[in-house]
Regions:
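Structural motif corresponding to alpha-helix initiation and N-cap regions
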Residues: 5-8, 35-40, 58-62, 83, ...
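Phosphate/diphosphate ligand-binding glycine-rich loop within oxidoreductases
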Residues: 48-127
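N-terminal glycine-/charge-rich "phosphate-binding" loop or analogous flexible N-terminal tail
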Residues: 1-49, 173-175
Length: 210
């Protein structure tokens, strides 16, 4: 992946702070450039690697995996593995690891800001005030978020955090569509109506995709 020497040193210091000395693992680290590397750059930079630590979305393709027979593990620093060819990894005997829930709270913090910004048109008023203008409302009065229905497409960690912010914070009604959510999770959220995709898009005033 893409990581700088400074970031690598920060990682080493973080490990050391909790009693883990990376040097005792007898490892060597190859650092790629900041931009997202190409297939060729990954192959050339990881010729002797046994583990690839992937930040960003580097293309860990079949070509890459077949060109690096020493690689045994690919660790993705994030939840998604969409840039990794999982079928090729399985065929090559490479174990792929990810970090479920990575930045879920941070994502759930940003989503309400964007939603409220759209409802209240804050970006427009911010620009105008910075220009020295103090415009009165030129559009319909914004709706009260407490009277709206928030539809969550995906009810993983980020979706559940967002539910807490809107339902517990504003009293907003929340519905969700997620074919993979377990019954155990559903039982923990009796206030959420789990609906079909068609019902989600017809009943929601706001839709947030997770």
């Amino acid at each position: 992946g893409s990581v700088s020497e400074i970031e690598l040193e920060q990682v080493k210091q973080a490990y050391a702070a909790v009693g883990i000395e990376m040097e005792v693992m007898d490892y060597k680290v190859a650092v790629t450039q900041q931009k997202e590397p190409t297939e060729e750059e990954i192959i050339n930079g990881c010729k002797n690697a046994e583990i690839i630590l992937a930040t960003g979305n580097p293309p860990i393709t079949r070509k890459v995996l077949e060109s690096l027979p020493k690689v045994k593990f690919v660790q993705r620093f994030g939840a998604g593995v969409n840039s990794i060819d999982l079928d090729a990894a399985a065929e090559c005997g490479v174990i792929v690891l990810n970090l479920p829930g990575f930045c879920a709270k941070e994502l759930a913090d940003v989503a309400p800001a964007m939603i409220m910004g759209l409802i209240r048109n804050t970006a427009y008023y911010d620009r105008e005030v910075r220009k020295g203008n103090w415009p009165k409302c030129k559009y319909l009065l914004p709706p009260d978020v407490r009277e709206l229905t928030l539809g969550l497409y995906g009810f993983g960690l980020a979706g559940r955090y967002l539910h807490d912010i809107f339902h517990k914070g504003f009293g907003t009604k929340v519905i969700a569509c997620d074919p993979y959510v377990s019954n155990a999770i559903k039982l923990q959220y009796p206030d959420v109506d789990f609906v079909s995709f068609e019902e989600l898009i017809t009943q929601s005033d706001i839709i947030s995709i997770h």
